[in-house]
């Protein structure tokens, strides 16, 4: 398939970069060679979590009046790239002595090969990495050679990475404050019913459906509200919204989701691109956000939902537990399960959490009665 070919090509590039790195010698940080400040390098225009992560760092440095520049860089295909928040500030110039590179370890070698050794030379290089399991892929370990330090969004990620390096690994959580805009969108804009209690499940196809686990949320919803005609009638004012970002990355995702919701007229499927302002408004427009994820490095959408005042139902495991607990969200119990096969980049034999629907089923009803 096209995806497999692309993965093989990327693996080849990474191997090439590893060979090149062994031949290269990155010049160590030299104080005074460059001005004090930060070069933020990442998918600044990206509509995905990596892009949002880089923009959060830019905003944080802005608010603290720290000198910095912003360089837009992504490893193809990169997904949709429509965010223009920092469009007028993008530059190729890197005048400062610290690089903060928002490229995950999986693509860090490609970034090195693409950007060039001179970007690394004489600077203090920080990789801002997210990862979602408690073990780290062996093939990504060479990426540690390219950094002086690693920052992560959660202790969950930090504790994993510390097993593999003696270099500093520091938790720098996302400072969540969704970009605001004077334009607000109501439910009518999204073709959603204005008179129903709506749950929302949202994920990016590039984030691996088996990890995001939307099928568990759909199953829990159907069990609670669509089990039979009597239940449907009783809860006719309740609905579930499924929003897939970048659905074009996985036609298989669309097909699977479509097959499990086709008999439910109170499940509303949304795909296609949304601007950041639309996403923020959608999070505020619904009544509850649901994430029965198997693992999260941080869980930005959950944090953003809480920020705009929308209650969250979430699996009680991984990065999200560092900013939510049973006092602030509806936490769902889980069993740890072993991956039965590879779900790239997550390898067979690793473990992650599987939300217990036994615990989940009453929760949506509890939410509707307590909202």
Enumerate the predicted regions with their spans.
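Short hydrophobic beta-strand element within catalytic cores of glycosyltransferases
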Residues: 311-314, 324, 330-331
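Donor nucleotide-sugar binding/catalytic pocket of nucleotide-sugar-dependent glycosyltransferases
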Residues: 14, 148-159, 166-182
